[in-house]
Amino acid sequence: MVDLVDHKKICSRVFVVGYPIHHSKSPKIHKFWLKYYGLQGESVSEEVTVREFSNFIASIKKGNFLGGNVTSPHKQEAFRLADYKDGIATAIGAANTLWIEGKKLLATNSDAYGFSANLDDFVPGWAGETALVFGAGGAARAIIYALKKRKFERIFLFNRTKKNADDLAEYFGKSTIKVYDWCSSCEKARQADLIVNTTSMDMINFSERENGAFFDFHKTKPTALVTDVVYTPLITPFLQQAKAHGLKTVNGLGMLLHQAVPGFEKWFGVRPSVTKELRAAILEDMGENRG
């Protein structure tokens, strides 16, 4: 017979799943909120390969978890395997937040919300007509959705595998999204109001041209806003270069913090706040001295 306390603990568990997953700060965020709001629960990391992911999803439906967050490389597969996808997840074509209702697995995507809320915190009223987006994975999908919601008229998309970028443009509509080769990103930067890196690579070292690094911030207009969804390190080489050219930058930590809000509310019934105390706790865990 299962002990009642143990059963309650099991049913209050949430996860963050990805591969690799050791870098994720999501469990730290969840644990901070659980303690702050006086809630019972547990957040765990689950490192699951692509091959094992469908079995992991099947285990969720057995009631082992309330739900959880999904990170790379599983967001599109999580969307596919969910029993029900809300309108946001369907529009994006990927899911990062899962929860159980009855015996059904439900999915949404909070990355677009997290991206916009992060910029709202640091650059209130941010807007523009033209954006450059590097990458064509799950994060790029959410950011394109967010930019379209903010009425950006042109989104220039760059990805090392051009076919993936072409597929993304087809999904969201080629009237707004234009795909270009990496080497043309510098010229397109002249038009950009917003430049977003969604890749996990060190872009400065990824692709060298004869005349230097593949992206040259010298050609970016001085009013452009530059952001990176990567948050480890907090100031990525991409952001370092932008700062060196006097451009306004926003790091990716806030996107991580804000995207965690909707899921936590669904699992535990409390809508948490992204506070200075939370940010400081995660920065301390990262070994950063910034406030």
From Swiss-Prot:
One Gene Ontology CC term in the entry: cytosol
Domain of life: Bacteria
Annotated InterPro entries: Aminoacid_DH-like_N_sf, NAD(P)-bd_dom_sf, SDH_C, Shikimate_DH, Shikimate_DH-bd_N, Shikimate_DH_fam, Shikm_DH/Glu-tRNA_Rdtase
Positions with a binding annotation for NADP(+): 135-139, 229, 252
GO biological process terms on file: amino acid biosynthetic process; aromatic amino acid family biosynthetic process; chorismate biosynthetic process; shikimate metabolic process
Residues binding shikimate, per UniProt: 24-26, 71, 96, 111, 231
Associated pathway: Metabolic intermediate biosynthesis; chorismate biosynthesis; chorismate from D-erythrose 4-phosphate and phosphoenolpyruvate: step 4/7
Keyword Amino-acid biosynthesis: yes
Its EC number(s): 1.1.1.25
Active site residues per record: 75 (proton acceptor)
GO MF annotation list: NADP binding; shikimate 3-dehydrogenase (NADP+) activity
Catalytic activity: shikimate + NADP(+) = 3-dehydroshikimate + NADPH + H(+)
This protein's record includes keyword rRNA-binding: no
Pfam family membership, one: Shikimate_dh_N
UniProt KW keywords: Amino-acid biosynthesis, Aromatic amino acid biosynthesis, NADP, Oxidoreductase
First-tier enzyme category under EC: oxidoreductase
Subunit: Homodimer.
Protein family according to the UniProt entry: Belongs to the shikimate dehydrogenase family.
NCBIfam families found in the cross-reference section: aroE, PRK00258.1-4
Function: Involved in the biosynthesis of the chorismate, which leads to the biosynthesis of aromatic amino acids. Catalyzes the reversible NADPH linked reduction of 3-dehydroshikimate (DHSA) to yield shikimate (SA).
Protein's name according to its UniProt entry: Shikimate dehydrogenase (NADP(+))
